[in-house]
Amino acid sequence: MDWLLACKALILGVVEGLTEFLPVSSTGHLIVAGSLLNFTDEHAKTFDVVIQLGAILAVCWEYRRRIGSVVSGLPSRPDARRFTLNVIIATIPAIVLGLLFEKTIKAALFSPVPVAFALVAGGVVILWAESRQRTRGETVARVQNVDDLGALDALKVGLAQCFALIPGMSRSGSTIIGGMLFGLDRRVATEFSFFLAIPIIFGATAYELHKDWHLLSVDALGTFALGFVAAFVSAFACVRWLLRYIAAHDFTAFAWYRIGFGLLILLVGYSGALNWTE
């Protein structure tokens, strides 16, 4: 593995880890970063899947006690079974739509310009949602604990997650903001979003690796391993930071970041500085 490829792997791993669980779209950032770094060949898709796996394993490690409690409690505890059922219910819509429209979405939307429009649109939605939260004043959210989620709440969040099939919209942003609009406390919506990422990303990883297993090679293992570790470490730090951040802040700063980043992508693209308008 040459040093330039190692640097690209490290950068992309950190980008994935820092953006997977923030409402800013990790897929959108990887598409833009991959284009800037000229890391867009057939191995790039498999690499993206590997670093996403690194990021999700960071969440599994952060919530290992909770996950262990749920798994061990499935035979005997109703709350563990209800939580597991809610995760399954919320996961199904995105899986179904993803399988149906995967090729269309990748052909039409997996490039920087569509990502830019989605970033801006998502930022506007977050600003509207936060404005709506402020107008409600000190009204207490209906769902204050992730264990109090009902099946209908889970389904609503799962439907919101479908917007994340559009690169640039953000899976975490769709589920967190959607959850808040549907009556979930900010921390509850954020934690449920973390748990929803586990089956979605594990499923996507298994699907993509099965489909592109022939792209895996001994020569690529070093690159994949470096990106994986970078994604794990940065995602672990980011999850811990985000949980502290939301205790005292809303998501307005992320909304303005999305809008600014999206407009910058469009400005750079349409100015001719970089050729990514197609």
From Swiss-Prot:
Keywords: Antibiotic resistance, Cell inner membrane, Cell membrane, Cell shape, Cell wall biogenesis/degradation, Hydrolase, Membrane, Peptidoglycan synthesis, Transmembrane, Transmembrane helix. The chain crosses the membrane at residues 85-105, 108-128, 188-208, 218-238, 254-274. It catalyses: di-trans,octa-cis-undecaprenyl diphosphate + H2O = di-trans,octa-cis-undecaprenyl phosphate + phosphate + H(+). Its EC number is 3.6.1.27. It is a multi-pass membrane protein. One of its GO terms (cellular component) is plasma membrane. GO terms for molecular function: undecaprenyl-diphosphatase activity. It is an enzyme of class 3 (hydrolase). It is found in: Cell inner membrane. Belongs to the UppP family. Bacitracin is thought to be involved in the inhibition of peptidoglycan synthesis by sequestering undecaprenyl diphosphate, thereby reducing the pool of lipid carrier available. Catalyzes the dephosphorylation of undecaprenyl diphosphate (UPP). Confers resistance to bacitracin. PANTHER family: UNDECAPRENYL-DIPHOSPHATASE. This is Undecaprenyl-diphosphatase 1. The gene is uppP1.
